[in-house]
Amino acid sequence: MPNIEIAQADEVIITTLEELGPAEPTTDQIMRFDAAMSEDTQGLGHSLLKEVSDIQKSFKTVKSDLHTKLAVSVDNPNDLMLMQWSLIRITIQEELIAKTAGRMSQNVETLSKGG
């Protein structure tokens, strides 16, 4: 095994915290910190709830439009087919959301159990 020589340090090394003194952040560090703190830090759960809320608002709008159309007697077969298609689409979307929410709750339960 070869010998390893370590050169003597010519600098004075600070070894205590008192010698270091208080740390002052730079202006760039302060700006980055302020920017990070001002961002939306609600997390994934908040964004999922916001999306579900937006979908709920969309459903309410579509359902109210459908109720308005149903209140008026429609004799046109095309309009009846469009209303039926809207109803089918709403039903399918609600079922998919219910299944997704059920699966997400199962995943959360699995994570909380630890595997």
Swiss-Prot record:
Keywords: Plasmid, Virulence. InterPro entries: T3SS_YscI/HrpB. It comes from the Bacteria. Induction: At 37 degrees Celsius in the absence of calcium. Pfam families: T3SS_basalb_I. The keyword Cytoplasm does not apply. GO terms for biological process: protein secretion by the type III secretion system. Belongs to the YscI/HrpB family. NCBIfam families: yscI_hrpB_dom. This is Yop proteins translocation protein I. It comes from Yersinia pseudotuberculosis serotype I (strain IP32953).
